[in-house]
């Protein structure tokens, strides 16, 4: 046959190999494919240069060697087809590659062997890298199951509980016969602490809350700190809210109960309302005859509902009512450590120091057991270790940072919170505690990765390296499960029809046989 067909030469048609369930039911709708002759195009300069340099010849030689290269049986799909793709029946894998939305799979159809091998290596590397990154993401989520981030920086301070303000003094009572009391061994350790402690609440003459003209002296209560100091606290074990005006105090020391210095001053401790202050509580020293402004900046720490699905070991914190304490119903790490220390002293000495967290059945140490308590604290300091008793931090708490502005009031005019009558201002201390801003910063504790973020991470990684999506998964399920099942059912239906037609033909032949 000549290359150019004549006028009477028949036209070449190529039938289309449909699947059985895709074959047209009407023969009129069957459109044969006609192979047209490719027109001779004019060769470009690039083609001539490549041909002159024998690059095309080398390319064809290497490509032919790749086609003749023996591949394992499981890599047979990488072998290029030897036909034009119309006469040879396509496999299900080839049909999937033609229709797949994953990048690079269409190269497996119609490309040469070396191109298929190259793309197969690239796809394998992409799959390996994507699964490596997914495993790394899961390992990071396992190592750090929680994350804390800033939820908002515009939280109104009017919705933040005001902290407890505890005032402690440095002065002590002048007991001339205190050594006699100790030598007589008649007074207990508890009685000695109570007798030598200087009350602070009677020295607070004026207390105004939120700049109202309501006296808040009745809300003051004496408390003992964990380092056995008698102080006076405002808003202890309560929950008050203030926008920015805060609380104001005026303290006047009594000269009769001071040992020597009239201007020793006070300490102002800022802490949460359900927390017992200790030696590490943030504080401000306010000297005598001074006016102190303490400006608070709260930081709210909350948690999401997703955190309740994690175990205690993974989240690393306690909920407010998850662990019961002796001191308060709300969990606090400082109170938990104080109870842990008390229980350790009880096991070591058989008693606990006075004014410590105590159960009703526990004994209070006397002066004879004081040395045992001192030795316990000394050994703990030397070892540098402290039993934590699983005292994890709380999941929800408020942290208060503050700045202070202290000025001496000598020669100053009494302000509105001080009586204007002619009273001596000796040893007078004015303290005002308030929020420095109407907004606060709120931090949120959440799980590092849940099922929704994992889907986003997995989809982003696989989409970046392979171009996969949910449509790709549905395609894979369809071509691996649905399509083979439909083909099998279609073949079974065809076989059943053939058997039925054969039985009908045999029955008709038997019925017509005797009649003839």
Curated annotation (Swiss-Prot):
Subcellular location: Membrane
Stored PROSITE patterns: ASC
Keyword Transmembrane helix (UniProt): yes
Ranges annotated as spanning the membrane: 117-137, 454-474
Membrane topology: Multi-pass membrane protein
One GO cellular component term: plasma membrane
Keyword annotations from UniProtKB, A to Z: Ion channel, Ion transport, Membrane, Sodium, Sodium channel, Sodium transport, Transmembrane, Transmembrane helix, Transport
Keyword Transport: yes
Main function: Part of a complex that plays a role in tracheal liquid clearance. In both larvae and adults, contributes to the behavioral response to salt. Probable role in sodium transport.
Family: Belongs to the amiloride-sensitive sodium channel (TC 1.A.6) family.
Protein name (Swiss-Prot/TrEMBL): Pickpocket protein 11
Organism, as annotated: Drosophila melanogaster
């Amino acid at each position: 046959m000549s290359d150019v067909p004549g006028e009477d030469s028949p036209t070449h048609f190529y039938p289309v190999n449909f699947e059985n369930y895709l074959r047209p039911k009407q023969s009129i709708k069957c459109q044969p494919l006609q192979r047209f002759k490719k027109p001779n195009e004019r060769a470009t300069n690039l083609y001539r240069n490549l041909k002159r340099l024998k690059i095309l010849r080398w390319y064809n030689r290497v490509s032919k060697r790749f086609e003749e290269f023996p591949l394992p049986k499981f890599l047979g799909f990488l072998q290029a087809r030897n036909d034009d793709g119309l006469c040879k029946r396509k496999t299900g894998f080839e049909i999937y590659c033609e229709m797949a939305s994953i990048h690079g799979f269409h190269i497996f159809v119609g490309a040469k062997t070396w191109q298929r091998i190259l793309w197969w290596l690239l796809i394998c590397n992409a799959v390996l890298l994507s699964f490596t990154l997914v495993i790394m993401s899961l390992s990071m989520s396992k190592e750090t199951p929680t994350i804390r981030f800033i939820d908002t920086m515009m939280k109104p301070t009017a919705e933040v509980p005001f902290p407890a303000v505890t005032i402690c003094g440095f002065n002590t009572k002048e007991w001339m016969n205190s050594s006699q009391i100790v030598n007589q061994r008649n007074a207990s350790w508890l009685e000695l602490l109570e007798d030598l402690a200087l009350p602070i609440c009677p020295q607070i003459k004026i207390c105004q809350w939120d700049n109202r003209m309501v006296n808040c002296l009745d809300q003051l209560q004496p408390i003992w700190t964990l380092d056995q100091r008698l102080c006076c606290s405002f808003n202890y074990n309560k929950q008050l809210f203030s926008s920015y005006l805060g609380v104001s105090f005026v303290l006047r020391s009594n000269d009769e109960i001071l040992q020597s210095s009239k201007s020793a001053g006070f300490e102002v401790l800022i802490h949460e309302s359900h927390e017992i202050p200790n030696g590490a509580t943030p504080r401000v020293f306010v000297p005598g005859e001074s006016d102190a402004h303490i400006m608070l900046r709260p930081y709210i720490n909350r948690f999401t509902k997703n955190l309740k699905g994690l175990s205690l070991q993974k989240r690393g914190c306690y909920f407010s009512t998850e662990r019961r304490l002796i001191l308060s119903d709300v969990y606090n790490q400082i109170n938990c450590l104080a109870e842990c220390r008390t229980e350790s002293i009880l096991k070591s000495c058989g008693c606990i120091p006075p004014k410590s967290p105590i159960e009703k059945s526990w004994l209070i140490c006397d002066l004879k057991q004081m040395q045992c308590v001192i030795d316990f604290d000394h050994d703990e300091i030397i070892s540098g270790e402290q039993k934590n008793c699983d005292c994890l931090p709380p999941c929800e708490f408020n942290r208060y940072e503050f700045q202070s502005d202290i000025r001496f009031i000598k020669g100053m005019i009494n302000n509105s919170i001080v009586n204007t009558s002619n009273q001596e201002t000796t040893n007078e201390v004015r303290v005002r505690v308030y929020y420095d801003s109407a907004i606060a910063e709120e931090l949120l504790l959440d799980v590092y990765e849940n099922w929704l973020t994992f889907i986003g991470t997995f989809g982003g990684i696989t989409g970046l390296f392979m171009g996969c999506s949910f449509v790709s998964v549905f395609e894979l399920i369809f071509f691996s499960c649905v399509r083979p099942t439909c083909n099998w059912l279609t073949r079974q239906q065809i076989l059943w029809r053939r058997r039925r037609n054969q039985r009908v033909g045999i029955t008709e032949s038997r019925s017509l046989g005797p009649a003839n």
